[in-house]
Amino acid sequence: MKIQAVEAMNDKKISFFLPSGEISEDGFSEMELKLKAMIEGGDFNLIIDLSRVSHINYKVVGSLIEYQQKFKKYGGDIKLVNVSPYLYDILRLYGFYPFEIYPSRRAALKSFA
């Protein structure tokens, strides 16, 4: 998984995750380590680019929602970009959908302003 960290608007640090392929429960463990490191480091703003993801396990969606709640507790957020219609359906079928979706990284960055 490729990860970038950049300084964005209002001096907020925004991290990017760019996973690829299928995000399974086992595959989520790598992402989870990075999410925990972000929290420990005081970084609470994340954009996940799903343009290279072919499938996401529904249990992973639940875990992402839990992390989003943790980030929001500290004034941050997790936002998604480049979500295919297939992935959107998986996310929507989870029952509720708290994530903001943007068509591009630039649009998501602006939303953190």
Regions found by a protein language model. Name each.
Residues 112-113:
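Receiver (REC) domain switch/output surface
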